[in-house]
Swiss-Prot record:
GO CC terms of this entry: cytosol
Species in which this protein is naturally found: Clostridium novyi (strain NT)
Cystine bridges: none
Role summary: Could be a nuclease involved in processing of the 5'-end of pre-16S rRNA.
Main location: cytoplasm
Name the UniProt record assigns to this protein: Putative pre-16S rRNA nuclease
Length: 135
C-alpha cells in the first residue's frame, strides 16, 4: 500500500510517497499553490500515478501541542482534499520537521538556493517517514 505524505503551506505543498511496501518515504515534488481547485487536481494526479491509498498530512502545532492558525488552514484544506479524493487522510504532528530538514541540508552543504527548492518535499519526507516508522 502506497502512502502519500504532505507538508501543506500557504505557498507550496511538499509531497513525498512511500515505497510500495510502506517502509521508506521519498520526496517527489513541491506543488506551487495556485488555487485550491488546481492544488487538489495536482494532488489527484499524483495519487493516481502512484496508486496511493492513504494520505498523511503534517499538522502544524504550537510547541505546547495546541493547533494554531496555520494548523486550522491545513485541516480545512485536508477536509476539502478528502471530500474530493474520497480517500482517508490522517493528520501527523509535524513539529520541527522543517527544522530537521534544514539541518540535514546544512550538514550536506547544500546552497541556500538548493535548500529553498527542496525544503518542502524534504519536510514531507520527514512527516511520512515518521508515520511509517510508527506503524
Amino acid at each position: 500500500m502506497r502512502v502519500l505524505g504532505l507538508d501543506v503551506g500557504d505557498r507550496t505543498i511538499g509531497v513525498a510517497v512511500s515505497d510500495p511496501l510502506g517502509f521508506t518515504a521519498q520526496g517527489i515534488t513541491t506543488v506551487h499553490r495556485k488555487s485550491v481547485k488546481e492544488d487538489i487536481d495536482e494532488l489527484k494526479k499524483i495519487c493516481k500515478e502512484y496508486a496511493v491509498e492513504l494520505i498523511i498530512s503534517g499538522l502544524p502545532k504550537n510547541m505546547n501541542g495546541t493547533v494554531g492558525e496555520q494548523g486550522e488552514k491545513v485541516i480545512e484544506f485536508c477536509e476539502l482534499l478528502k471530500s474530493e479524493l474520497k480517500m482517508p487522510i490522517k493528520m501527523w504532528d509535524e513539529r520541527l520537521t522543517t527544522v530537521a530538514a534544514h539541518r540535514a541540508m546544512l550538514e550536506a552543504n547544500l546552497s541556500r538556493a538548493k535548500r529553498k527548492k527542496i525544503v518542502d518535499k524534504m519536510a514531507a519526507t520527514y512527516i511520512l517517514q515518521g508515520y511509517l516508522d510508527s506503524i
